């Protein structure tokens, strides 16, 4: 397992190119699994279920077709994006379990900062109850699987400019807002969040099994 960390924002095309190359190498057993933690410059991405009507400010930032599941989301500085390239041939061919584990990864990491992240039936991602029936989204998930190799992953709001989410209907859900660690009073650094994510990953996913691959 390789952990990669980007010190400066990574362009979206560069990230896509890296993932395409890496998952091909994982499939051919020429590279190991990888988690890449990074930030992007401000941009919007459209998943395969995105409704064009949900792009409210099309000229605000660059918009990219992501190829992942889900709808529109915002990426930008202060948001920790995790691209998770795992070999499900070795880990059990269960995409639902993989998505559930990504949610658990964020829930555990948030708990280290005394934030209670929660799942919601029918709404992939992580939510925080704010009282009075209000709840805001703090973590998003959008994945793709090719030949049982995962790519894309999750985005956790640490200290992004939350106003930038107003240019879209985030994940197609207009009834709820977005929040971040800083918005909730937890002024964690990205490096502190990275450490929490790594610990949570080890607890949730564990090491990659070493048994031989089955044909696909």
UniProtKB/Swiss-Prot annotation:
GO cellular component, one term: cytoplasm
Residues noted as binding substrate in the record, renumbered to the chain: 68-75, 140-142, 153-155
Pfam families according to UniProt: LplA-B_cat
GO biological process, one term: protein modification process
Main location: cytoplasm
Molecular function as annotated in GO: lipoyl(octanoyl) transferase activity
Catalytic reaction equation(s): octanoyl-[ACP] + L-lysyl-[protein] = N(6)-octanoyl-L-lysyl-[protein] + holo-[ACP] + H(+)
Domain BPL/LPL catalytic intervals: 29-209
Tagged with keyword Phosphoprotein: no
Listed pathway(s): Protein modification; protein lipoylation via endogenous pathway; protein N(6)-(lipoyl)lysine from octanoyl-[acyl-carrier-protein]: step 1/2
Top-rank taxon: Bacteria
Annotated keywords: Acyltransferase, Cytoplasm, Transferase
Top enzyme category: transferase
InterPro entries in the cross-refs: aa-tRNA-synth_II/BPL/LPL, BPL_LPL_catalytic, Octanoyltransferase, Octanoyltransferase_CS
Catalytic site positions: 171 (acyl-thioester intermediate)
Localization of this protein: Cytoplasm
E.C. no: 2.3.1.181
Marked site (Lowers pKa of active site Cys) residue numbers: 137
Role description: Catalyzes the transfer of endogenously produced octanoic acid from octanoyl-acyl-carrier-protein onto the lipoyl domains of lipoate-dependent enzymes. Lipoyl-ACP can also act as a substrate although octanoyl-ACP is likely to be the physiological substrate.
Remarks, miscellaneous: In the reaction, the free carboxyl group of octanoic acid is attached via an amide linkage to the epsilon-amino group of a specific lysine residue of lipoyl domains of lipoate-dependent enzymes.
PANTHER family: LIPOYLTRANSFERASE 2, MITOCHONDRIAL-RELATED, OCTANOYLTRANSFERASE
Family: Belongs to the LipB family.
Protein name according to UniProt: Octanoyltransferase
Annotated source species: Rhodospirillum rubrum (strain ATCC 11170 / ATH 1.1.1 / DSM 467 / LMG 4362 / NCIMB 8255 / S1)
Gene behind this protein: lipB
